[in-house]
């Protein structure tokens, strides 16, 4: 996805992002498809539930400018330096019943953004574990 923002007093801003992911049903269920929309299958064995394994990569680039470090004490920023980030996510879903799901994700983040406070690029690379229980009808 690419976006361009018109700005009155500065050059236009352009940023982009994209992702790709895949999901595999470990217990052999088939995906439903109706009217151009995929649907989550029901567990083949309601007693054991359905297990899924997923992988995702996403990235965003919100830098549309540059930093001139000719004078390290006072770098000059031109344009927008919104940062860059990419993530790898590995996840597992367990559909305990047809209307109850447990999800767990592990996310590795790689991000970098220019900081005017420290006058340099700052990396932030957390590792995140997410867990969710979901009831739906």
Feature-to-residue mapping (PLM):
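Outer-membrane beta-barrel pore domains
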Residues: 1-137
């Amino acid at each position: 996805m690419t976006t361009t923002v018109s700005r009155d007093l500065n050059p236009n801003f352009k940023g982009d992002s994209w992702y790709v992911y895949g999901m595999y049903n470990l217990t052999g269920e088939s995906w439903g498809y109706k009217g151009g929309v995929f649907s989550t299958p029901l567990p083949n064995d309601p007693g054991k539930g359905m297990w899924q394994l997923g992988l995702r990569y996403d990235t965003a680039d919100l830098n549309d400018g540059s930093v001139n470090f000719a004078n390290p004490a006072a770098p000059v920023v031109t344009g927008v330096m919104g940062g860059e980030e990419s993530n790898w996510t590995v996840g597992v879903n367990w559909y305990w019943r047809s209307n109850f799901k447990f999800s767990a994700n592990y996310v590795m983040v790689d991000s970098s953004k220019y900081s005017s406070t420290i006058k340099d690029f700052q990396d932030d690379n957390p590792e995140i574990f997410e867990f969710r229980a979901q009831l739906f009808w």
